[in-house]
């Protein structure tokens, strides 16, 4: 190592020339040993010509090797389907951070643990849920994404891609970019592409339709619902300006007493019950429509791969007030397909009950 104030280690000494000595010249005086010492250099590092340079410091130890990757599980996790993933780095990064989509029961139990104060402690709860795949939309394709997710519960002979749903919807004139502002058009698209039964429900999710919806869900069939989406994806009331689609695949029902037999209490959450798979069970009594906080829909939508639990009355009220086309969409310069009569005629108070064809397995 060379200091900024370093100098040559060997002093500059004139070379010694060996000549024949002159006997008349007296011998030189002996050198005084202290005169052999070199003056100290004008810097903080003192170096003697008789001492070697100190060895350089050892190199730093290499970092420890990374931990080995976890052993693969017996069942490979199913990652959410992301439409447009190949073209979106943002979606790729989000998907890598999020990991596999959780199963329905486990995701609902996570919600119950996080928001336990939201659910009435004076009731026991029965959870009916079916596992849906997750699909993240790209652009205004929330309705078609919801339909694609619902296909998993419809025993469709051949899987239909989201790209195929978009293509057919455009060819039939139901959409320009993937948007769906007509529940009736969605029903026709589902019948054609998924070969399923599609029942158009009018008049809202309350009144006599309420029991039909609940019976449909506890049987394990999907329900497509248009609603106004809040910032957290939950239902709100924006007069249709935030119109969005979700697919419901289950329901959480609060009851005074759990019917027996056919239900088993959850091992982690006391007071939560599940129907025993494959065992006959008596359907529970549905809570009165006027009973607050006793009924929640289990839903998914195209902006998250997690299930969400929504208060049934909030979904009902949001679905009933879809009346206007968004002014922001009207001014964005894009083309949208809106049915005659507008958003109110196409979405307000409507939902879609989907079932497999008779004889399907």
Swiss-Prot record:
Protein name per Swiss-Prot or TrEMBL: Actin maturation protease
Entry's localization field: Cytoplasm
InterPro entries cross-referenced by the UniProt entry: ACTMAP (IPR040043)
Oligomer and partners: Interacts (via N-terminus) with PFN2 isoforms 1/IIa and 2/IIb; the interactions may facilitate efficient cleavage of the acetylated N-terminus of immature actin. Interacts with PFN1.
Segments of skewed composition (Pro residues): 24-33, 52-72
Biological process according to GO: protein processing
UniProt key word Protease: yes
Region (Peptidase C39-like): 134-254
The species this protein was found in: Mus musculus
Keyword set includes Hydrolase: yes
GO molecular function: cysteine-type aminopeptidase activity; initiator methionyl aminopeptidase activity
Domain of life where this protein originates: Eukaryota
């Amino acid at each position: 190592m060379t200091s900024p104030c370093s100098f040559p280690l060997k002093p500059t000494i004139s070379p010694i020339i060996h000549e024949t000595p002159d006997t008349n010249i007296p011998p030189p005086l002996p050198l005084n040993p202290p005169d052999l010492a070199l003056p100290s250099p004008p810097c903080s590092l003192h170096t003697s010509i008789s001492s070697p340079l100190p060895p350089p410091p050892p190199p730093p130890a290499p970092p420890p090797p990374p931990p080995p990757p976890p052993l693969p599980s017996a069942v490979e996790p199913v990652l959410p389907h992301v439409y447009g993933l190949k073209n979106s780095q943002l979606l790729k990064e989000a998907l890598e951070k999020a990991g596999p989509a959780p199963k329905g029961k486990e995701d609902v139990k996570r919600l119950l643990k996080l928001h336990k104060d939201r659910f009435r402690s004076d009731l026991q709860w029965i959870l009916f849920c079916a596992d849906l795949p997750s699909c993240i939309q790209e652009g205004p394709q929330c309705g078609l994404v919801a339909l694609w997710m619902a296909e998993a519960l419809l025993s469709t002979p051949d899987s239909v891609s989201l790209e195929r749903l978009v293509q057919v919807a455009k060819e039939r004139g139901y959409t320009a970019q993937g948007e769906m502002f007509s529940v009736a058009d969605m029903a026709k698209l589902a019948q054609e592409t998924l070969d399923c039964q599609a029942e158009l429900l009018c008049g809202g999710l309350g009144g006599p339709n309420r029991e039909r919806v609940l019976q449909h869900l506890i049987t394990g069939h999907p329900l497509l619902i248009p609603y106004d989406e809040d910032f957290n994806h939950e239902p709100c009331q924006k007069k249709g300006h935030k119109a969005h689609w979700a697919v419901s695949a289950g329901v959480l029902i609060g009851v005074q007493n759990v019917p027996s037999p056919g239900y088993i209490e959850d091992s982690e959450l006391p007071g939560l019950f599940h129907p025993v798979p494959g065992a006959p069970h008596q359907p529970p009594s549905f809570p009165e429509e006027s009973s607050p906080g006793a009924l929640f829909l289990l839903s998914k939508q195209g902006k998250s791969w997690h299930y969400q639990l929504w208060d049934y009355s909030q979904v009902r009220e949001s679905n009933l007030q879809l009346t206007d086309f968004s002014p922001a969409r009207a001014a964005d310069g894009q083309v949208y397909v809106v049915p005659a009569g507008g958003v109110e005629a196409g979405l307000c108070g409507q939902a879609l009950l989907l079932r497999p064809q008779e004889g399907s397995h």
